[in-house]
Amino acid sequence: MKKKNIYIIMEMVRRELHGNLLLTLISLKKSFNVYISDSSTFKHLLKKNLINPGIIHTKSITHGEAKSKFHQNLHEKKYLITAIDEEHGLLDDFDYEEYFITNRVSKKELDKTSAFFCWGKYDYKILRKYFTKSKNKFYLTGSPRSDIWKKKINFEKNKDEEQIFKKPYILICTNFSFSN
């Protein structure tokens, strides 16, 4: 049996690498070929017909006309498009529809998508309710990126970790983007 291909599009390495590596490990165990790169590389390879159809996994589905054309090209060439929005939808005291759905998910792009993975029940329930005709495209999976944060996935114990967290500490957020 021929192995199927998964192409993972990564935009921000610092944010997405670890979660995508976890996704890669799981996919490799299930006998997929996995390729990770940025969208411009995949666009070039697609244009030159240097990659075979498979699953394209991206970090968002709605991101301007260039991404829409790329998705259309993939869709026409029989690629399956899947996505998880890396910027999730939990926004304190903001209207979810106005600030997340309108900017991050569109019916036009969702029609080209085979699966949209949700971080949690909040996203999952609202998106299924909002996009009733496409509700079966939404999957409650969690985020590979946030799975890395959990203690149960402890690839290698840091010897100093216990000492560090015994003392009080201050966490300073250095990324003040709106929904990240």
Describe the predicted segments one by one.
Residues 3, 167:
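Phosphate-coordination loops involved in phosphoryl transfer and adenosine-cofactor binding
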